[in-house]
Amino acid sequence: MNNIIDGKKLAEEIIVKVKAETIKLRNNYKIQPGIAVIIVGDDPASHVYVTSKSKKAEECGFFSIKHMLSKETSEKELLQLIATLNSDPKIHGILVQLPLPAHINTNCVTQAIAFQKDVDGFHYINIGKLSCNTLEDAIIPCTPAGAMIMIEQQCGRDLSGLDAVVVGRSNIVGKPMAALLTAANATVTIAHSRTRDLDDVCRSADILVAAVGRPQIIKKDWVKNGAIVIDVGINRIAAPEKGIGKTRLVGDVDFEAIKGKTAAITPVPGGVGPMTIAMLMVNTLNAAARLYNLPVLKL
């Protein structure tokens, strides 16, 4: 049995549903979901991410606009743009691509986005709803939301009796991932780079989510037989076998060594990454639906 979770295939199945719901909104209610993506500066990786998100939004039938700002843009100017988008009825989702230049306070920017349009799920109100298990009208961060669908596909929605370990404590992935697993009745441990005996902690996991941002830190003997392994890490390492100066992408998990002992595992690339973009589309669609008190897409 193939135990490698195909994130591209699963994401495409979700996008098909988003497209269908978008057509319903347009035909029945004359509503077109709209997303605004903001990028500040000229970081090449950020531009790649923004382009892929914008293309996917257009593919889904959304109104999509990109704001490409110079790295000299002031925090005040960025906040003014966000205020304009907050009041724009055509825009239902606002995304500011991170990281921002050092002179801009990231927290001020993420909290300036109206929580109803916070399709990244970073606003304190959305974080609070998630923490309090009020998920019906919360906007969930895209990567944990996508990872959770992958876990549910393997284990079902009720994770009672299962031990889950999340390696990583970021506000973007680690903490919301732990909250989602807790809401699904798993027994959850949050571990990180300073956790004592991290290998032993990981070995206890029926479900192991690696989101620490260290290439291939999770070794074969850290994972118990039959575990579900979700690799959120995206790390670029040297690949001399490809030529001088060449690199390749790897996750936080030593994939080749571990894949044979897992019940299911996500690859990098092609695992959680496509699901992140798919869930951004779901969040934008649902933000538009909620604005008009219409049913949301449930996966």
Curated annotation (Swiss-Prot):
GO biological process: L-histidine biosynthetic process; methionine biosynthetic process; purine nucleotide biosynthetic process; tetrahydrofolate interconversion
Reaction it catalyzes: (6R)-5,10-methylene-5,6,7,8-tetrahydrofolate + NADP(+) = (6R)-5,10-methenyltetrahydrofolate + NADPH; (6R)-5,10-methenyltetrahydrofolate + H2O = (6R)-10-formyltetrahydrofolate + H(+)
Family per record: Belongs to the tetrahydrofolate dehydrogenase/cyclohydrolase family.
Summary of the function given for this chain in its UniProt record: Catalyzes the oxidation of 5,10-methylenetetrahydrofolate to 5,10-methenyltetrahydrofolate and then the hydrolysis of 5,10-methenyltetrahydrofolate to 10-formyltetrahydrofolate.
Protein's recorded name: Bifunctional protein FolD
UniProt KW NADP keyword: yes
This enzyme's EC code(s): 1.5.1.5, 3.5.4.9
Pathway(s) served: One-carbon metabolism; tetrahydrofolate interconversion
Gene Ontology cellular component terms for the protein in this record: cytosol
Binding sites annotated in the UniProt record for NADP(+): 168-170, 193, 234
Pfam families recorded: THF_DHG_CYH, THF_DHG_CYH_C
Self-association and partners: Homodimer.
Entries under CDD domains matching the protein: NAD_bind_m-THF_DH_Cyclohyd
This protein's UniProt keywords: Amino-acid biosynthesis, Histidine biosynthesis, Hydrolase, Methionine biosynthesis, Multifunctional enzyme, NADP, One-carbon metabolism, Oxidoreductase, Purine biosynthesis
GO molecular function: methenyltetrahydrofolate cyclohydrolase activity; methylenetetrahydrofolate dehydrogenase (NADP+) activity
